[in-house]
């Protein structure tokens, strides 16, 4: 069954939203992250997603103490991403009680290290974040979306699916933080070619209709802005995906 996965992006402990990954286009929400996650959990969320934007910019400033507190205080699975660049960072997050670690640019820039991480920590502990943009074909973007690589999305998926990859988080960059609706075509395409990969869809979720369109295609739908802005509630999202 497709799950709704509520997401929080944090900069220096504050809940924020960026538009298309741009730190200059930042909206700060006056929410306590722990209280917000507990609210989401109480409403029925089974998984939570956290992006450490401080750590993404500077790994030496990763918000580990806060992440550990959040992982300990909520009883559902927490997955964390944000510029993970090393095996040590993956281990530190898993040691904090994080269930899954999201790794992105490394998968394109250092496949050897990425494969080592998959092997060492297991495919259930790792989610590959493939941020994609449509050129002539879907290509993967790297470095917090600032540049498009020459790697085609389907080729990257083919490579890693043959190495035991199970979970991906795929974001259509053109949609993220825009509330313009999700790119259903993209997720259908991935699901048809790689039926054994669990897809988490991210970027642009603006309505319950978006959730409905992804039902049965994706294992999870990451929702940030729509929940923070009160477009729909967790309960409504769960009901929509259950029907």
UniProtKB/Swiss-Prot annotation:
Gene3D superfamilies: Aldolase class I
Any one of the GO CC terms: cytoplasm
EC number(s) on file: 5.3.1.16
Family under the similarity heading: Belongs to the HisA/HisF family.
Catalytic activity: 1-(5-phospho-beta-D-ribosyl)-5-[(5-phospho-beta-D-ribosylamino)methylideneamino]imidazole-4-carboxamide = 5-[(5-phospho-1-deoxy-D-ribulos-1-ylimino)methylamino]-1-(5-phospho-beta-D-ribosyl)imidazole-4-carboxamide
GO molecular function, one term: 1-(5-phosphoribosyl)-5-[(5-phosphoribosylamino)methylideneamino]imidazole-4-carboxamide isomerase activity
Record flagged with keyword S-adenosyl-L-methionine: no
Protein encoded by which gene: hisA
Main location: cytoplasm
GO terms under biological process: L-histidine biosynthetic process; L-tryptophan biosynthetic process
Entry annotated with the keyword GTP-binding: no
InterPro entries the record matches: Aldolase_TIM, His_biosynth, HisA_bact_arch, Isoase_HisA-like, Isoase_HisA-like_bact, RibuloseP-bd_barrel
Pathway membership: Amino-acid biosynthesis; L-histidine biosynthesis; L-histidine from 5-phospho-alpha-D-ribose 1-diphosphate: step 4/9
UniProt enzyme class: isomerase
Protein name as catalogued: 1-(5-phosphoribosyl)-5-[(5-phosphoribosylamino)methylideneamino] imidazole-4-carboxamide isomerase
Family matches, as NCBIfam families: 1-(5-phosphoribosyl)-5-[(5-phosphoribosylamino)methylideneamino]imidazole-4-carboxamide isomerase
Keyword tags: Amino-acid biosynthesis, Cytoplasm, Histidine biosynthesis, Isomerase
Catalytic residues identified in the record: 9, 131
Subcellular location: Cytoplasm
């Amino acid at each position: 069954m497709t799950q709704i996965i509520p997401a929080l992006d944090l900069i220096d402990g504050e809940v924020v939203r960026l538009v298309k990954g741009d730190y200059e286009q930042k909206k700060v929400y006056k929410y306590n992250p722990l209280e917000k996650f507990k609210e989401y959990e109480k409403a029925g969320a089974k998984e939570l997603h956290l992006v450490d934007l401080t750590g993404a910019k500077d790994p030496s400033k990763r918000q580990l103490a806060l992440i550990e507190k959040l992982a300990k205080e909520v009883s559902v699975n927490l997955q964390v991403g944000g510029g993970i660049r090393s095996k040590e960072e993956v281990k530190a997050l898993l040691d904090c009680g994080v269930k899954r670690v999201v790794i992105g640019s490394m998968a394109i820039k250092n496949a050897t290290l990425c494969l080592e991480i998959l092997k060492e920590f297991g495919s259930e502990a790792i989610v590959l974040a493939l941020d994609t943009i449509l050129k002539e074909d879907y290509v993967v973007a790297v470095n917090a979306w600032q540049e498009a690589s020459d790697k085609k999305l389907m080729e990257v998926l083919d490579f890693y699916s043959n190495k035991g990859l199970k979970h991906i988080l795929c974001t259509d960059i053109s949609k993220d933080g825009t509330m313009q609706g999700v790119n259903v075509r993209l997720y259908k395409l991935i699901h048809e070619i790689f039926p054994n990969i669990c897809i988490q869809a991210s970027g642009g979720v603006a309505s319950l209709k978006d959730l409905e369109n992804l039902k049965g295609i994706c294992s999870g739908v990451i929702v940030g802005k729509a929940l923070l802005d009160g477009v729909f509630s967790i309960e409504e999202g769960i009901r929509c995906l259950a029907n």
